[in-house]
Amino acid sequence: MLKSFGYSYIDSINIDTTPLQLDQNSIEDVANAIKNCYLCDFSKSRKAPLTGSGSSSAKVMIVDHTVSLTQDSSGNYFAGKSGEMLQAMVENVLHLDTKNDIFFTHAIKCKPSPHAKGFEVEWNSCKSYLFKQIDLLKPKIVIALGKEAYAKLSGDKEENFQNIRGSIIKLNSYTLVAIHHPSYLLKNPQEKRVAFGDLQRIEALL
């Protein structure tokens, strides 16, 4: 039915996360494992890893790519102009509470080191944590903030982001929807209307 309202669907994608499974049995256990993780160089420059914020019973999970300098220094997931915009998007368009209705985390849990590129080594260290969080939370919808977060979640590095942005993608046991990152919208305010439409589609799925 949703197709008749302009919704775009993409065929299901299966990501094999079996080799990545951890022994942790709760979101809190995963958070403790992240806090004690020193598998890559990013752990050396971080103030503290950001393990995830929000409700462990949330049906909506938001995944950013990496921890920003502002987030790392403040410990606040919604710090800075980008964070403030994301909070407004969640509260004013999705009509969700950032503490009780969502779980916000990052694909890469620590602030990148200066001049770091690619993040493949760091992603290989972090991806087990992210997929374990998804496995434990069992969200209905996962929102990827930007191209990089989408690529980490889907394993698709080549897809033109404009082609999949806003599409409803069946990914294993949940629905994945990629939207523009708030930092992109701050630089390209003309795209806010597009992001608003994407968020309205997500709200209709809840």
What are the residue ranges of the model-derived segments?
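A polyanion-binding, active-site-adjacent surface
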Residues: 1-206
